[in-house]
């Protein structure tokens, strides 16, 4: 019996599912299936995105749009967790605190005034983002040099790319803004952010994007998220169809507390991702259904068009055939009319029939192909052409024929030919005073 994750899969999809699991090492079959479905079962794209995810590289198969996503930071339901610095303890602690308070106040006041005045002289170079990816890579290298290579997988792309990938994959995005000059940054990175339990949680359940606020890209994100202190973490997810900050963690937080807070934020907002995933699947199904309906409509339309085309072709074929039959009929009528006119002309041109008493006359009995007989007299001096014209003028005669004598059996040259350009006379042809000639039908030859 197939596992639940493998139900409704074709053999090819099952093979891809097992191959993808072997290549990526993901234990959950359902997670493998979701990854392949997100890439339309494109094995190469799914594996490459999984490798990119492990290295923190944005997807190369789904480039982000040119316009960055807007993040909703004005939601009053944002979960905020702030860790304040511990209060001084004992008389010595309070004494040191009170002595340093005026100096600290003066230092930060002068520093703020200096920075404010400097803006009028020279704009903050961090406000111009020229190489955002370079800022991320530079921070990642400096982080590894200072805190080691054991850390959560950095997303090696811009903030906008991270937002787009988190939205596309329906995952949580954890943003870390690093304050280089803050006194708690080093301790947080070494003890909390690089803790094995924290690394495992972040790598398995969310995307992780980080940058220093001293970098233009980090400064730009800082202006959008408006952190109050460092270390600063913001949890962002797709909520109500907008990328929204759902949690803010500020201050020096301990590893266990960090894990608890991140888990709490994810558990509290997991229903939104589930709801969005269901809505997305419903939209995809609706889109697939609409596409199938469109394809069915187009197929029906093409079938109707093909049927209409064949109908027009059949109608045109019948029209051409009827026109051809009509033309043949007209041509046959013209031919018959021309033949009849030719018969009448031949009849009018025949010389008069000699009298029976004329010694130079020849009595010829013609036996026609329809077994009828015709008798007429001709003069010995007349050409055999006269005999042919007489027979041609008869209504019973075929259109094409030849005249044959029986004793001896021969064909009389009644029409001009290469052998007989001028047909002979009856006398030259050797006809006697009384002859029986046979008319041979040549119409079908």
From Swiss-Prot:
One of its GO terms (molecular function) is ubiquitin binding. Plays an important role in endoplasmic reticulum-associated degradation (ERAD) that mediates ubiquitin-dependent degradation of misfolded endoplasmic reticulum proteins. By controlling the steady-state expression of the IGF1R receptor, indirectly regulates the insulin-like growth factor receptor signaling pathway. Involved in inhibition of lipid droplet degradation by binding to phospholipase PNPL2 and inhibiting its activity by promoting dissociation of PNPL2 from its endogenous activator, ABHD5 which inhibits the rate of triacylglycerol hydrolysis. Residues 275-350 form a coiled coil. Its main location: cytoplasm. GO terms for cellular component: endoplasmic reticulum; lipid droplet; VCP-NPL4-UFD1 AAA ATPase complex. Residues 357-439 form the UBX domain. Residues 12-48 form the UBA domain. Identified in a complex that contains SEL1L, OS9, FAF2/UBXD8, UBE2J1/UBC6E and AUP1. Interacts with YOD1. Interacts (via N-terminus) with UBQLN2 (via C-terminus). Interacts with PNPLA2. Interacts with ZFAND2B; probably through VCP. Interacts with LMBR1L and UBAC2. Keywords: Acetylation, Coiled coil, Cytoplasm, Endoplasmic reticulum, Lipid droplet, Unfolded protein response. The keyword Transmembrane does not apply. Disulfide bonds: none annotated. GO terms for biological process: ERAD pathway; lipid droplet organization; proteasome-mediated ubiquitin-dependent protein catabolic process; response to unfolded protein; retrograde protein transport, ER to cytosol; stress granule disassembly. This is FAS-associated factor 2. InterPro entries: FAF1_2-like_UAS (IPR049483), Thioredoxin-like_sf (IPR036249), UAS (IPR006577), UBA-like_sf (IPR009060), UBA_8 (IPR054109), Ubiquitin-like_domsf (IPR029071), UBX_dom (IPR001012), UBX_domain-protein (IPR050730). Gene3D superfamilies: DNA helicase RuvA subunit, C-terminal domain, Glutaredoxin, Phosphatidylinositol 3-kinase Catalytic Subunit, Chain A, domain 1. PANTHER family: FAS-ASSOCIATED FACTOR 2, FAS-ASSOCIATED PROTEIN.
